[in-house]
């Protein structure tokens, strides 16, 4: 695979990325980060799979003929491959991704997006806009753990966004069946992410709009997060 991050839309940084070794290290760092982010998001039945299917579906809906039929064939094939697993995973949990499955999707989706973006000359912010959910999850987790809870960023604390949604649903709705709670959590987060993914695909060449979209998602995410997070989350563990 000839995968490269050739630009981030900032001239100063782009100059460094043109240096092959720096560009390669930045790519490796970015992929390692997003692969782990996908694993973090894989918390409940169907959650990561629904997100991946949403990404691929919006790519299909906003397909441009200039991208080539091979690209469309690949995305459709990947969509149905993931959908096959999804049918057994959601909502009854008959089949699970596991760490290996989450890492695999964490590599396939971003690499596909990077190739798609730079092969077609779309805004480099398009990749971030599509991956904004797992990126935001990791970013807020690091800030919460390191700066507020004074603990290692690698140490689990049970305060990820999907976990807080689950706790709220368990209290408010009171579903006895765990799988039904998983179902509601997945649909809730899907309803938040899908409009942003669709908007990113419709304006994938508009850097200003994509930057605004990323900022709006981050603010929206933080607003909902603060409405759910318990007070002890900002103290030491």
Task: List the predicted regions and their residue ranges.
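"…together with the soluble PPM/PP2C metallo-phosphatase catalytic core" -> "…together
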Residues: 1-139
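Membrane-interfacial segments
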Residues: 45, 91, 117, 144-147, ...
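Alpha-helical transmembrane segments of multipass membrane proteins
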Residues: 84, 136, 140, 192-197, ...
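Select subsegments of transmembrane alpha-helices in polytopic membrane proteins
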Residues: 100-102, 178-192
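Extended hydrophobic-aromatic, low-complexity segments
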Residues: 121-125, 142, 154-155, 207-212
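Cytosolic, membrane-interface loops and tails of multi-pass inner-membrane proteins
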Residues: 140-179
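Short basic/hydrophobic patches in alpha-helices and adjacent helix-turn junctions
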Residues: 167, 197-201
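Alpha-helical transmembrane segments and their immediate juxtamembrane interface regions
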Residues: 202-237
